[in-house]
Amino acid sequence: KVVGAAVYKDTENVLPLFAMQAALGGVAFCASQEKTALILTGGEISAEWLLEQVSQIQRKAGQFVVFDLKNVIAELPIENRANCFDATVAAYLLNPLKSDYMYEDVAREQLGLMIDEKADGRTKACYEAYTAFAAKEPLENRLKDTKSWELFENIEMPLVFTLYEMEQNG
């Protein structure tokens, strides 16, 4: 089963300059065309509990699809590297001349979906999780059609983890 996921950062009480340092506010998930859920931290849901749940979902998913996996690894526990699919890397391989690979672009290019730029962060996290889920199959099919699947699977995906580890170790 394919699971799309996205990190929601709680940036409401943080200056824009420090938005990347904001605390984990929640995680959005999508595993069907009909439903996307955002689980927020706060109240009875601690960040630690949420991360445990994410770990279980990630480990058991057939494919765990996110945008910008290298940055997601810093926020979410990734125990099963073999089932990860980085939609950003896939989009890059399909169009290496672009300067950025935002989920909004993938939504438009792969799904014909326009994302409301004025949506709040919570809504955007849900859109990102949905786009990760829904775009996985078309991205994979296009990678196979362009003979880039083996490059993606055998070189690019393992490299994401290597680059993350290099950044962590200095």
Where are these regions (language model features)?
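Mixed-charge, glycine-rich, non-catalytic linkers/tails in nucleic-acid processing enzymes
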Residues: 78-79, 106, 118-170
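A basic/glycine-biased coupling hinge at the interface between accessory DNA-binding modules
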Residues: 111-114, 118
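Conserved RNase H-like, two-metal-ion catalytic cores of nucleic-acid enzymes
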Residues: 1-110
